């Protein structure tokens, strides 16, 4: 990480009330090194510029920590891909128990590689479809927080996420600048799955287009029939 990108990461997070030490900055640097190397073979991200990676991936992920008064006791990330937002949050909060769900084998291999490189603990990768994970009794209604970035439209994402949350837990769903259409289309899914949109926050990252964070709170148990079989939520949204 160049001095300028390290300064951007440290200064911006400090402005947000978050603190990064030298070890964490070194972990972020190694993370980007591995991402850029693996990206040449596996196309993990369309972003190639290192400074843009800091803004669009690292800072965009770390912004989610601003909504917590204290870190959650458990987090599961859906469709983790290259690890955003969960891996930056894990680096920020080393004690946070994290589960990454990634159905694509090559991406899951990359995630395990980065976890080993960064010597992260209390974190695991599930190379499974999210519909299968959501019907697993050991995972279902277990988590305080679900994160998912660029996975699906909100009404589909709700069927993936809400079965994993315990009552009072939260889905953090980064969205574009105007998520109102997605929220309106998700009202039936919210009613069926036991959730409500509790906040929609503006997200501002230096030199990036404004976007938003939709927060959904689980308010009632999710019926056992959800999530439906693999592929059905995306093909037939609620």
Curated annotation (Swiss-Prot):
Pfam families registered for this protein in UniProt:
GidB (PF02527)
Key word S-adenosyl-L-methionine present: yes
Q: Which InterPro entries match?
A: rRNA_ssu_MeTfrase_G (IPR003682), SAM-dependent_MTases_sf (IPR029063)
Instruction: Give the transmembrane region(s).
Output: none
- Give the first-level EC class, as a single word: transferase
GO MF terms held by the record: rRNA (guanine-N7-)-methyltransferase activity
Main localization of the protein described in the UniProt heading: cytoplasm
EC assignment: 2.1.1.-
Compartmental location: Cytoplasm
Sequence positions that bind S-adenosyl-L-methionine: 79, 84, 102-104, 130-131, 149
- Keyword Isomerase recorded: no
Xref: CDD domains: AdoMet_MTases
**Assigned GO CC terms:** cytosol
Keywords in UniProt for this one?
Cytoplasm, Methyltransferase, rRNA processing, S-adenosyl-L-methionine, Transferase
PANTHER family given in the database record: S-ADENOSYL-L-METHIONINE-DEPENDENT METHYLTRANSFERASES SUPERFAMILY PROTEIN (PTHR31760:SF0)
Hey, which family's this protein in? Belongs to the methyltransferase superfamily. RNA methyltransferase RsmG family.
Its biological purpose is as follows: Specifically methylates the N7 position of a guanine in 16S rRNA.
Name of the protein in question: Ribosomal RNA small subunit methyltransferase G
Q: Which organism is it from?
A: Chloroflexus aurantiacus (strain ATCC 29366 / DSM 635 / J-10-fl)
Gene from which this protein is expressed: rsmG
């Amino acid at each position: 990480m160049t001095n300028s990108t390290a300064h951007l990461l440290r200064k911006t997070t400090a402005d947000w009330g978050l603190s990064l030490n030298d070890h964490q900055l070194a972990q972020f640097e190694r993370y980007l090194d591995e991402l850029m190397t693996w990206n040449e073979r596996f196309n993990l991200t369309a972003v190639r510029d290192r400074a843009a990676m800091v803004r669009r991936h690292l800072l965009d992920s770390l912004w989610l920590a601003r909504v917590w008064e204290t870190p959650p006791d458990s987090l599961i990330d859906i469709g983790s891909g290259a690890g955003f937002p969960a891996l930056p949050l894990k680096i920020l909060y080393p004690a946070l128990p994290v589960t990454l769900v990634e159905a694509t084998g090559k991406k899951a291999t990359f995630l395990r590689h980065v976890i080993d490189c960064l010597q992260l603990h209390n974190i695991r990768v599930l190379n499974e479809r999210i519909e299968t994970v959501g019907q697993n009794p050991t995972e279902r209604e277990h988590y305080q927080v679900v994160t998912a970035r660029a996975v699906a439209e909100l009404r589909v994402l709700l069927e993936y996420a809400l079965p994993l949350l315990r009552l009072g837990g939260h889905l953090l769903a980064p969205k574009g600048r105007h998520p109102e259409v997605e929220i309106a289309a998700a009202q039936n899914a919210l009613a069926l799955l036991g959730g409500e949109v509790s906040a929609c926050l503006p997200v501002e990252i230096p030199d990036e287009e404004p976007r938003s964070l939709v927060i959904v709170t689980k308010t009632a148990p999710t019926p056992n029939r959800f999530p439906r079989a693999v592929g059905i939520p995306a093909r037939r949204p609620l």
